[in-house]
């Protein structure tokens, strides 16, 4: 495992250098350095991510020499409707920011997912929910579902940011 300089984690983080991992062309993905810092800070042996996007969590875990369980709508896992397949000691969650970036049919083909996995990802894509109230309801459901899948004493880190529209902050 590579030697990693520990950075202190706060509620606000900034990584001027993104680092390697995931696909920086996949809109909305985070720096793998954040995930590596979480792995280091909590001395993790495994990390789970149920909305893994471009695979940044998996890449960071591989770089740090630990296991990962990563899933996404585009790879056959629907957090709204599927059971979480394992108990988690640590879950990382970076959900979509309402309607800022749409994923199904923009970042990946919904038709291909439907053909491969038998469901239409647009029906469960949080980034396609039309009202703020329904989005928050779905987010709360997904949050509690992941929380309930934690092992006793397990932890969950959630990466969120501001939603800004017309120069005013919504959240």
Task: Tell me what each language-model feature is.
Residues 1-171:
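Class I S-adenosyl-L-methionine-dependent methyltransferase catalytic core
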